[in-house]
Amino acid sequence: MAATRLDSDERRQTIVDAAVPLFARKGFAGTTTRELAEAAGISEALLFRHFPSKELLYREILQQVGCQGDPVLEQLATLPATTATLVGMVRFMVRRFVAGNEADRADLDPRLRLVLHSCLEDGDYARELFDAVFARVVPFFTASLDAAVQAGDIVPPPASRESGEGWRSNQFWFGHHVATMIAMAALPGRYCVPYAGRPEALVEEASRFILRGIGMSDAAIAAHTARNSGAGGLKTAAD
């Protein structure tokens, strides 16, 4: 039976799918075009026909493993800016990084490895990815942060007067760093940091740590955690 010929879009996607684990394992500089072609089961000539340079292929990966088209963002856009939404966002983020199912990990691990390799190289991939996250996610976070401040559930830290408007986005990034670092510690297949407790317990502890860090009162954390332990209305595909 003759092999089915792929159209241009299908071939490009096949190349991207084959390239992601290679770049994640070896980094941009350490991956050759020959290896990329072999992984995709094509010749280098055909690879260059679809992606004239390795940089263009890398950029395509950025667009696909960034937050574009993430259904969670569509859910966020429908939620009101409230303390409850802020608590839900933080808990959802931590859960996704720390206690995701096998499908979540299969999607997340290559992204984390790509970011780590990028930070060890020129940082361009990580910079562009975080710029995309900033543009798409941070506005939802800061709107709910402002609402929580107005409700009296958060007292901005003293340093906020020094960093001006930037203190709000900093709170997002600090929380993001906590969640991603826990996830990175699990990349070898088992944690290389001796955390106490199971992943679900880590979700609760890390979420509370982040929320306290942004100035939320224990009373507000407890109230909104108890009211909606399912991440403030946010759902994953597995939910």
For each of these PLM feature ranges, what is it?
Residues 3, 105-112, 126-135, 149-209, ...:
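Hydrophobic/aromatic-rich alpha-helical bundle segments in the mid-to-C-terminal region
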Residues 14, 22-64:
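Helix-turn-helix
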Residues 60, 73-110, 158-168, 203:
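Hydrophobic alpha-helical connector segments
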Residues 67, 83-127, 138-142, 179, ...:
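Helical hydrophobic small-molecule/effector-binding pocket
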Residues 68-72:
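Conserved phosphoryl-transfer catalytic core
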Residues 76, 119, 186-190:
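Secondary-structure edge/capping motif, primarily at the C-terminal ends of alpha-helices
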Residues 143-147:
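Hydrophobic protein-protein interaction segments
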